[in-house]
């Protein structure tokens, strides 16, 4: 593939480095760069020490990158040192931008005016305390703040884009930031790519790997495709990036996948199973009955906007007594087959269907561990039932791998796919 403009991301913040706060900026910026056709070479995370930040910038510069993007360290406190470090790295003097200082002051004044105890007479001290945020490297291009922290682009080779740490500020600022002349000049060599996503469920990763090895030896110009695969909770996501001229090569690979794994492919347009289920549930009424997943399936179904139009309700029946009292499961059925069994899953689904006046119900009962397993029903044994009012009934028992959290999450994914298949028939 042709060499594109290359970028690196430096995420700053001791709270991110130590894991107290999850990095949401690096992956998000990476997606934006991918859409622009900019090759991401590195993402690094460092603490707030100036020497560590500068070391990351120099490492990035040594990789011959066109653009370095930093996030974090733009506040008014003593440990917010990113701008000062970037100025030193770029060999630029720090100067006070009077217009920017006024902009920040006006934002602060509006924010403080919401406080009934705000005394305008004390504002000068607040303005002085935040003056640091108006200090910028000479020649830097200013990106208007969303909060109080402005962003910056310092032109050069590499250009440096400086963005705030909070995602709620960084993300709205991105479009303006990447349109800055310094940023546009840095990524002028970007390549136009197409990107396609195929999602599969029920296919071992080794099965996909074998098919791709076959494609590599039988499809001309296979090397023109940049293919990445990711296995998540039993689903496989295959993302392919290519230049427009390789469209026919990708089409051949997609055909090969359909021929070999058509039953496992559930999306070729990037849609997730949650999106597909939401569409299939339009004009329906669904209820859930959950034991080991304790409401995770109901939470997932209601995560999509508009779900109130089709989700009637759910029952978490963790105990046998709750299964009997809330869902009408016959205690004798539990005594005969055990709480983790297909007959009980069917009875739970039927109870949810009746209790909520729904036309579709999903039930999950299982052993998430680490205790509770037996030789006959080891940890990871989960029973599912999808019941549709017209008589369709899909029941499965699976042994799911992983720890307690893995088993619970995988169970919700399996339930979503069983629901998708039942409603697609």
Curated annotation (Swiss-Prot):
Q: Which domain of life is it from?
A: Bacteria
**Any Pfam family matching the protein:** MoCF_biosynth
The record's annotation in InterPro entries points to: CinA, CinA-like_C, CinA_C, Competence-induced_CinA, MoaB/Mog-like_dom_sf, MoaB/Mog_dom
Family indicated by similarity: Belongs to the CinA family.
Q: What is this protein called?
A: CinA-like protein
The record lists the lineage as:
Bacteria, Bacillati, Actinomycetota, Actinomycetes, Mycobacteriales
Look up the signal peptide feature and give its range.
Answer: none
């Amino acid at each position: 593939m042709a060499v594109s403009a290359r970028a690196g991301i430096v995420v700053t913040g001791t709270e991110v480095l130590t894991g107290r706060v999850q990095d949401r900026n690096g992956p998000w910026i990476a997606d934006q760069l991918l859409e622009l056709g900019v090759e991401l070479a590195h993402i690094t995370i460092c603490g707030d020490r100036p020497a560590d930040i500068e070391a990351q910038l120099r490492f990035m510069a040594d990789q011959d990158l066109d653009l370095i993007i930093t996030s974090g360290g733009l506040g008014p406190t003593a440990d917010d040192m990113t701008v000062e470090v970037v100025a030193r790295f770029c060999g630029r003097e720090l100067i006070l931008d009077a217009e920017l200082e006024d902009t920040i002051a006006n934002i602060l004044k509006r924010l403080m005016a919401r406080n009934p105890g705000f005394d305008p007479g004390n504002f000068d001290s607040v303005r002085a305390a935040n003056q640091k945020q108006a200090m910028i490297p000479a020649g830097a291009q200013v990106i208007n703040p969303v909060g109080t922290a402005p962003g910056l682009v310092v032109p050069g080779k590499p250009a440096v884009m400086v963005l705030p740490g909070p995602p709620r500020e960084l993300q709205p600022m991105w479009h303006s930031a990447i349109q800055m002349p310094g940023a546009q000049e840095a990524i002028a060599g970007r390549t136009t790519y197409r990107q396609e996503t195929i999602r599969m469920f029920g296919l071992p990763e080794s099965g996909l790997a074998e098919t791709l090895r076959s494609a590599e030896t039988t499809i001309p110009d296979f090397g023109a495709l940049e293919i990445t695969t990711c296995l998540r909770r039993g689903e496989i996501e295959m993302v392919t990036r290519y230049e427009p001229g390789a469209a026919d090569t990708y089409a051949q690979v997609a055909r090969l996948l359909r021929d070999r794994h058509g039953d496992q492919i559930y999306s070729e347009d990037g849609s997730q199973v949650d999106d597909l289920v939401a569409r299939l549930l339009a004009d329906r009424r669904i209820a859930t009955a959950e034991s080991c997943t304790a409401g995770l399936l109901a939470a997932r179904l209601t995560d999509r906007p508009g779900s109130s139009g089709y989700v009637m309700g759910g029952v978490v029946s963790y105990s046998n007594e709750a299964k009997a009292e809330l869902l009408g499961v016959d205690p004798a059925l539990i005594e005969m087959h055990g709480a983790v069994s297909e007959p009980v899953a069917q009875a739970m689904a039927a109870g949810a269907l009746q209790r909520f006046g729904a036309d579709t119900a999903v039930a999950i009962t299982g052993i998430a561990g680490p205790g509770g397993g037996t030789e006959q029903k080891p940890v990871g044994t989960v029973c599912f039932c999808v019941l549709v009012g017209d008589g369709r009934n899909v029941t499965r028992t699976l042994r799911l791998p992983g720890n307690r959290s893995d088993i619970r999450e995988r169970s919700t994914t399996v339930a979503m796919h069983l629901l998708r298949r039942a409603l697609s028939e």
